[in-house]
Amino acid sequence: MERDPLYVVSPSYISPKTIRFGKILVWSSFFLMMVIGIIQILYNLEKISIGFNNWRPLLYSYILWAIAIGYSRVLIYGERGKRNLFIFPAVMFIISIVIFPMLFGLYISFTDWNLSSLDGRKFNGLDNFYQMMSDPYYWNSLKNMIYYILAVLVEFAIAFLLALLLNSQIKGRKFFRVVFLIPLMLSPVAVSWMVGKSMLEQRFGPVANFARWLGWETPTFFSSPEIARLTMMCMDAWTFIPLMIIMLLAGLQALPKEVLEAAKVDGANKWTMFKNIIFPIMLPVSLTTLVIRIIFKLKLADIIIIVTAGGPGGATDSVTSFIVREYRDRSNVGYGTLLSFVYLILIIIFMTILIRFVNRWLQRAS
């Protein structure tokens, strides 16, 4: 009976020669992939005259490297290597759709690639970075993001009050729970057209007519920078406050009933119960809700793009909407990609600091 060459009982039975062959196999295939990738990059940058017409050789070398890794894991680790093969396809898939696109995007960010140019993309070093440092509209969008993120605190206060209301014994609370969730069921694009383009329309919109009835002679919601920014905040809040309500309501319903009943017996009023019992116990849920809402806020773009296109004068631009317009309106792929990478780095730094602050606060509270 022919012996399975991959079958081993324990790594101790694997010969040093087999282990050495497995390491040589994976490193040689990796070296081959890197050489092909470097040659192709230099060829596209017109630094060398030898190269390939497309990126298929790099794809084939990547597939060869993946096969070599899987086979070498079995050769080196035996049965444990076979178990690793079950997660190996997922790991290689993540590398394919995350790591490689990020590396390609990093390369694009150092080029002058513009889709309207007939010259194609060329390496321009740090020119895109210098352009970003002197771009007032980009820094204005970063300043706007500070306003948008601070608005999350107001959204949280409104969501907490509504969650307390829906958690109380009021008539028709099941009906109101469904009604409050309707904005969350709508897509931001639908909200943009339904509210921003229709209800807030200056001439015939019902909200504008109501504002005239209240005494506002020219109700323009998007002509003034401050009013336009506030309108964007309200539209985005109307869409995502229901999500915060769901999370906070789940936390309120999980509160221990015995503690609340004991506080009532001791004569505590509603404000005392909220300040000393409900809010401290709800602190982990509240902070989690704030973090998740901030993550969604950092991606704010669709409402702004459809309703105001960043206007007036960039007053409502978020970083994401500004980057989208660099791609779509100006076709600046290289510059827009650099802005995306810089924004990604800022988000990672900000969220790391925020999560550490939240963890320390929770540790002190506990």
Show the residue positions of the predicted features.
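A structural signal for multi-pass alpha-helical bundles of membrane permease subunits
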Residues: 36-57, 78-366
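Transmembrane alpha-helices
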Residues: 1-79
